[in-house]
Amino acid sequence: MLKLIKDSLGKFNLTLTDKQIEDIAFFLEEIYHSNQLFNLTGYKTKELIAEMLGVKTILLAQSLSYIFSNQSLNVIDIGTGAGIPGLIIKIIYPQLNVYLVDSNAKKITFINEVIKKLNFTGVFAILSRVEDNFFLKKYHGYFDYVFSQAVSKIAVLNELGTQLLKINGQIIHFKSRDYQEEIEFAKKHLSDLGLAFNNLYHYQFNSYFLVNVFYNKKAIAPQKYPREWSKIKRELIDDAKH
């Protein structure tokens, strides 16, 4: 795995240390082996794991260097799955306090084992859904940044994340080329959620194209948000298809 990562990263001008690359390779190797026992990811080969979970996530993390470098911030990865992108972001920006949240117990157990093996501090794997009352009460207004790759819809992550943000905190959406319709659909919910569109940034790394879409938290949202998942799914996912 280490050779795969090094060979793939050789074509990019990145400033990772040998230790960071080794830690990422170790993490991806753990994903590969654990994926033989239970479903951590749909990518089954070392080559696909190295490229799709490794290289693409490293490039995503590099695109955030202007906000994460040398900053001590509280950030949360919602629906982290196997720890992507949150744990790689932690490896690249070790001063961050990174919270990795997922409702799958096996995946959280896996992440905790990796954290222990890498002897990391300032990273926390939590078994929960972010819309659960206990989680919301504990982490209301706690985070500087909310992000997710698992929650693909802009309107959905905005609703799930707004109560967790500090005022002036930001939600980051990781998109590719198809995002304009999602931005338009999300507009009608922004005022209720206390959010405002901030900006979007395009990045081209050889054949990789990334778009980061940012929303700022301007006000505290009503207590009814986030709603039950069934309502979110019906109104923000199913309705958006029509």
Curated annotation (Swiss-Prot):
Q: What is its EC number?
A: 2.1.1.-
CDD domains to which the protein is assigned, alphabetical: AdoMet_MTases
Q: Which UniProt keywords apply?
A: Cytoplasm, Methyltransferase, rRNA processing, S-adenosyl-L-methionine, Transferase
Classify the source by domain of life: Bacteria
Q: Does the keyword Cytoplasm apply?
A: yes
Where in or outside the cell it occurs: the entry states: Cytoplasm
Annotated Gene Ontology cellular components are: cytosol
Query: SUPFAM superfamilies, alphabetically?
Result: S-adenosyl-L-methionine-dependent methyltransferases (SSF53335)
Give GO terms: molecular function aspect only.
Answer: rRNA (guanine-N7-)-methyltransferase activity
Entry keyword Zinc: no
- Enzyme type, top EC level: transferase
Kindly list the positions annotated as binding S-adenosyl-L-methionine: 79, 130-131, 149
Matching InterPro entries, A to Z? Answer: rRNA_ssu_MeTfrase_G, SAM-dependent_MTases_sf
Protein family per UniProt = Belongs to the methyltransferase superfamily. RNA methyltransferase RsmG family.
Q: Which HAMAP family match?
A: 16SrRNA_methyltr_G
Function comment: Specifically methylates the N7 position of a guanine in 16S rRNA.
NCBIfam families named among the record's database cross-references:
rsmG_gidB (TIGR00138)
**What is the name listed in the Swiss-Prot or TrEMBL entry for this protein?**
Ribosomal RNA small subunit methyltransferase G
Q: What is the lineage of its organism?
A: Bacteria, Bacillati, Mycoplasmatota, Mycoplasmoidales, Mycoplasmoidaceae
